[in-house]
């Protein structure tokens, strides 16, 4: 049976490639970049799982509904 790599391993491998691709350049804002790139697909997937119900999605994520709404707007995931 094949098991999928966990999310942390996927992120680690992508960071290794990211730093390799920089070819010695010093990056800026890596923390925010990673959070934003992980957060958007997470929010999109959870919203799909919840059929667009923000209250249900917020509960699933452990966020306040207003916080979720702010993040959805930030990532342009709301019309």
Question: How would you describe each model-predicted region?
Answer:
Residues 1-6, 13-79:
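Bacterial C-terminal helix-turn-helix
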């Amino acid at each position: 049976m094949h098991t999928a790599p966990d999310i942390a391993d996927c992120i680690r491998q992508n960071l290794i490639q990211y730093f390799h691709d920089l070819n010695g350049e010093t990056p800026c804002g890596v923390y925010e970049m990673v959070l934003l790139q992980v957060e958007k697909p997470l929010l999109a997937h959870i919203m799909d799982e919840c059929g667009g119900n923000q209250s249900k999605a917020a509960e699933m994520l452990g966020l306040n509904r207003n916080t979720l709404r702010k993040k959805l707007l930030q990532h342009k995931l709301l019309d």
